[in-house]
Amino acid sequence: MNKWTDVKKVVLAYSGGLDTSIILKWLQSELGAEVVTFTADLGQGEELESARRKAEIMGIKEIYIEDLREEFVRDFVFPMFRANAVYEGVYLLGTSIARPLISKRLIEIAKETGADAIAHGATGKGNDQVRFELSAYALDPDIKIIAPWRDWTFKSRTDLIEFARVHQIPVEKDKEGEAPFSVDANLLHSSSEGKILENPAIPAPEYVHMRTLSPETAPDKATIITIGFKKGDAVSINGEMLSPATLLAQLNNYGRDNGIGRLDLVENRFVGMKSRGIYETPGGTILLTAHRAIESLTLDRGAAHLKDELMPRYAELIYYGFWFSPERKMLQAAIDLSQEHVEGEVTLKLYKGNVIVEGRQSKKSLYFDKLVTFEDDQGAYDQKDAAGFIKLNALRLRTLAARSSVL
């Protein structure tokens, strides 16, 4: 029985790929609904007009294809990097951070077109279904959300491929002559899952990596770059002021050429299972190292340590899909306040998968060489003061030791 009989018009997050092309036809045939397609250019590097052509062939009248690269980096990626956010110590959240923006536009387009539902192609096993829907409900509590993977009878990607063949929907092939890996990509990263990658004991084939040279084949000569920061955001490379998306794209090029940003990860999904993914985040890996380096000069110790304590919770909120939650916004306000004086330049050496800090400088620096010098500090610091500092900090330890000696 069709539980969506009252749905007349649906906005579909449409990539033009296998899953969403099948979903489009399923929405038309099973629901009898009018479908509006929305394709976001987040820097995935694909020719998006093919999505328009596929949608037109399938009878779609309202087609939205939008370049959201600048908004994506400015309003989502950069705020996240101010926090130095990584999930489970290593994952730079490239997929997670893209979902709130897509959901935001789905809701906006639904209102513009009079649609009463939105739809996405995330499976019932993954995190993306949660991220899309939590974001959508945060922006429109009454929106209807259709997740075909949770409703239809297909059980696997093999079933989808057979459906596609029956309905003459093209299926692209990868280098092994089989159906493609499950791939997600945007300006921040790319990820690959599925097929041979589902066995975490087997190394990922080299052809899975789409965005980086292997460190072994990267140039033998290092690349030196300087990144400029203002209020915690990267604003320039080698002295040239750049827009957020242009800057990240250039960092991606540097990272690609030097084999930087590869990650083979088994992660804990929000839904409770573990999954294995191959991630490439070349520009983001460079940016994270540079941002931490400029913070080391300009952030007070207390603020820096508190940020590091809050970061895992902040990263978890993004990974789980709570970008629009009050707690994420509260943390963001604190993080943004901490970035007021985070400005200056960081010089990096990029070499065969490594990002090495060569130097950093800032007019807002809290590093004073007269305080730390091993030479004559001309009275800037009286070493005798350390004795009282140590004695007071040792008081509770001495008290504990005294009690132990009595016992």
UniProtKB/Swiss-Prot annotation:
Catalytic activity: L-citrulline + L-aspartate + ATP = 2-(N(omega)-L-arginino)succinate + AMP + diphosphate + H(+)
GO cellular-component term (any): cytoplasm
Gene Ontology terms, MF aspect: argininosuccinate synthase activity; ATP binding
Residues binding ATP: 13-21, 40, 121
Positions with a binding annotation for L-aspartate: 123, 127-128
Listed EC numbers: 6.3.4.5
Residues annotated to bind L-citrulline: 91, 96, 127, 131, 182, 191, 267, 279
Known partners and oligomeric status: Homotetramer.
Family of this protein: Belongs to the argininosuccinate synthase family. Type 1 subfamily.
Protein name per Swiss-Prot or TrEMBL: Argininosuccinate synthase
Lineage: Bacteria, Pseudomonadati, Pseudomonadota, Alphaproteobacteria, Hyphomicrobiales
Gene, per the UniProt record: argG
